[in-house]
């Protein structure tokens, strides 16, 4: 099997002993409630870190869609590993984009878009506007760049340049691991620092490392 969804995926996760959890946070619930109440402009409701949600909701006219649907019903985690045998794994979890249309599928479960790994070359995973990664097959493209002799930073740089070339709405981030254990992260978002966490067998705790910011 390559892809499991819905009840089957939930059943498999339980069999594998995965812990169930609530993806909602107090902040995400506060922002969502502000959207429901049309209270983005109320003082103290939205802090600066969530301004992107307000901009997105307004630019995409989500209030109109919400009023039509009236259906009451946040981040992505990327993990990659290289073991002593040279086996490489990548995993992505996501709660999807905020205020999405029912049925919308992002890049995380799409092998080649949101994540990809190949023992011969390395692994890559993405977070950001999933539609952009799907259009570019970003994770697979990064591995293709590694296959053609680029190092992780060069591969990440070109992949983020490819995202800019789409001229789409939203940004993209990625992390890259090659088959030698070299790592890097990258982002297309101007106001964001690209960082990731690294850990190996010689370390007692994980360390935060700086990635690169790629602009047009």
State the predicted function of each range.
Residues 1-216:
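N-terminal nucleophile
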